[in-house]
């Protein structure tokens, strides 16, 4: 009585092996076809974009939390104007100043551009983060070939974190009223 069951198992194992072999062959064929398409696409990408000639100001926008910063990047000597004031006056905290200048320092362009910024909303940290994003976007527009460096450092990534809204029945966004068992 046990022999018919063994024969059925052997037949199903043979069928499974045939299915696996067919699937593997189909996968290899698909990979080879896609690989050819990817190879031609990557060959096109190796052509680097030439830097844009700065004939006018580059204008970009950066956002972080509730802050919005509009930046105008023009050829100059490395001067910053934030709502009509210098960077040191507007951001007295050295950490915020370093955060803002980071994209320029990374690409070694600290004294190549003058930056005029309009900052609205949020607090100093949010404004500094938005300012950094706007500067990075402007540098990317100036020379798209340097996009990889900016992206790798995380300067072109918009930080999507924002304050979570308060929910009904809770004290804050997640703080629930104290629980009493009895």
UniProtKB/Swiss-Prot annotation:
Keyword Ribonucleoprotein applies: yes
The terms under GO molecular function for this entry are: RNA binding; structural constituent of ribosome
Species this protein is from: Corynebacterium glutamicum (strain ATCC 13032 / DSM 20300 / JCM 1318 / BCRC 11384 / CCUG 27702 / LMG 3730 / NBRC 12168 / NCIMB 10025 / NRRL B-2784 / 534)
NCBIfam families recorded for this chain? PRK00132.1
Entry-linked Pfam families = Ribosomal_S9
Assigned keywords, A-Z = Ribonucleoprotein, Ribosomal protein
Tagged with keyword Ribosomal protein: yes
Signal peptide range: none
Q: What is this protein called?
A: Small ribosomal subunit protein uS9
Q: Offer one example of a GO biological process linked to this entry.
A: translation
Domain of life from the UniProt record: Bacteria
């Amino acid at each position: 009585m046990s022999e018919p069951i063994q024969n059925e198992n052997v037949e199903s194992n043979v069928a499974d092996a045939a299915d696996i072999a067919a699937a593997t062959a189909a996968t290899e064929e698909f990979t080879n076809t896609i690989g050819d398409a990817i190879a031609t696409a990557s060959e096109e990408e190796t052509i680097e974009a030439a830097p844009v000639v700065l004939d006018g100001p580059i204008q970009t926008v950066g956002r972080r939390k509730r802050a919005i910063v509009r930046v105008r990047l023009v050829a100059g000597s490395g001067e910053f104007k934030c709502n009509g004031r210098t960077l040191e006056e507007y951001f007295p905290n050295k950490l915020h100043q370093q955060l803002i200048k980071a994209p320029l320092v990374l690409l070694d362009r600290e004294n190549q551009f003058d930056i005029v910024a309009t900052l609205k909303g949020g607090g100093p940290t949010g404004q500094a983060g938005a300012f950094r994003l706007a500067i990075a976007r402007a540098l990317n527009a100036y020379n798209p070939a340097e996009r990889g460096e900016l992206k790798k450092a995380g300067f072109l990534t918009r930080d999507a974190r924002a304050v979570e809204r308060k929910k009904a029945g809770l004290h804050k966004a997640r703080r629930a009223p104290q629980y009493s068992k009895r």
